[in-house]
Amino acid sequence: MITPPKNPALGFTLLEILVALIIFGLMSVISFRGLSSVAQSRAHLAQENRKWSEVALLFARLEQDLSMLANRPVRDAANLNAAPLVAKSILQSESDTQLSFTRMGLPDQGNVLAAPTRCGYRLQGERVEQLIWPATDAAPRTIPTVNLLMENVAAVEFTYLDSTGTWHSRWPLPDSDMVFPAAVQMVLDLKSGERITRLFALPALQ
């Protein structure tokens, strides 16, 4: 009769090894999914931060431009007199804008104001653009500088408040002596589904 050794050699059975491999594989999958979820969350957060930063910068740019309104009539590309602030809902040319106005020049390094310029805003495709003309009186072939302010925008709507508290989609108003509206409202519809409304009170320059 053979007596088994008192201290048998220690080791893992094949079944134990397979169970350990399965557990290790499951833990690896869970860890990978967790890291992937964290990476996706970070990317989404960065995209959201960038989107809202662009919205804030767009509103800040328009607010700055509107705060520098100048009551100076201009001549348009057709050599016709145009009001200091012009608003339309339908664009008719490549350089046309939904909102355009005369803006005081910015100060240079010597704190001397530059000459007034013509400034405009529009939605072109899915892009909100600012247009700057080199002179207030536009020659027929004057090409404005186009600055991209924001992308992925579904719609932009401007409305204008008169002295009676009525909102209008165009400016100037027929049979009215109001040069500027009391306020401008901008409604921004983003491709991601949000709608943002911002009201800009205008300086009293009538």
Give the ranges of each region predicted by the language model.
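N-terminal single-pass transmembrane signal-anchor helix
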Residues: 1-2, 7-35
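Extracytoplasmic beta-strand-rich oligomerization domains located immediately C-terminal to a leader/signal peptide
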Residues: 30-136
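Juxtamembrane/interfacial segments around transmembrane helices
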Residues: 65-75, 148-149, 198-205
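A short, structured loop/turn motif at beta-sheet edges
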Residues: 94, 122-127, 148-157, 191
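Short histidine-centered beta-strand/loop micro-motifs
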Residues: 109-113, 140-142, 169-170
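Short, surface-exposed coil-to-beta transition loops
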Residues: 114-118, 143-144, 181, 197
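Short aromatic-glycine motifs in intrinsically disordered, low-complexity regions
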Residues: 135-148
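Short linear sequence signals and composition-biased patches located at protein termini or domain-edge surfaces
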Residues: 152-206
